[in-house]
Amino acid sequence: MPLSEVAGHSVKGLFSLHGATLITRVLHALQQAGVRRIAVVGSELLLHALPSLDAEMLFAVEGSDPVDNLLRGVERLGLPSEAQFLHCAVDLPMLTGSALCDLIHAAPPDADVVVGWTPESAFVQMFPGAPYTALRFAEGRFLTASASVMRVGFLEAQLPLLRRLAAARKSAGKVALTLLRAFHYHLATTGMPLAARFFTGRLALASLPPIAQRLLGARLHLYLNAAPELAYDIDTDEDYRYAQAWLQAHSRYTL
């Protein structure tokens, strides 16, 4: 059955889980994390469903792709190139303020982009029996977090690469091939060895920041203890059903 039929709506942010929509859950978590200004980028249907919060909320209609949405949010907030901002997906049903705080506090002031990774062991412990996909690295198995910290200047400077990565984001293999093409000038020395290590699970996450600095001029920081709540998103009806049951069994996540 299509996800929209199971969830009762075609707009993810308006999926209802245990009495609250996804957009309401995420916005409350952002406020609990101390975020004072929030740009919501999405369907106009979301505009009429925004909860009343103490935080200042701004709205922008969604663009053609996720990167366009980031640009619209940054523009709506009026952020300068040197500013860092927190990006958070809307389909995080178990999101908490503390999970976001951990990510925010882990972001070095000089980082251009902070990417969160959740250890598989922590995810499975919190969400036993949940559907998920983990990637294997030299440091172990991890899930990607659906929240990140980014500098506006990095977003502006890396638009072509970020658009290609956004288009490939649902497939680890496609992401790897996208990066391989991006490093074509260093194919023999960096691209091919990097891809080989990735596909065999031998790639060390710790090796990526120096590569990003050398090839992109970007300061990449990897946070390898991102909370499981940041890694559970909803892409399938199975994801939705599990989240609904999990929230019903954990009353402290009730808004």
Per-region residue spans from a language model:
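Short, conserved phosphate/pyrophosphate- and ester-handling motifs at nucleotide-, phospho-/glycolipid
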Residues: 236
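Short amphipathic alpha-helices within nucleic acid-binding modules
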Residues: 240-246
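Short beta-strand/turn micro-motifs composed of small residues
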Residues: 41-44, 89, 117
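Conserved core of the sugar-phosphate nucleotidyltransferase
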Residues: 96-214, 225-229
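N-terminal glycine-rich phosphate-binding loop and ensuing alpha1 helix
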Residues: 1-45
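Short phosphate-binding loop-to-helix
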Residues: 51-86, 94-95
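Residues at the starts of beta-strands that form the adenosine-phosphate
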Residues: 36-38, 84, 112
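Conserved active-site beta-strand element of glycosyltransferases/polysaccharide synthases
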Residues: 221-224, 233
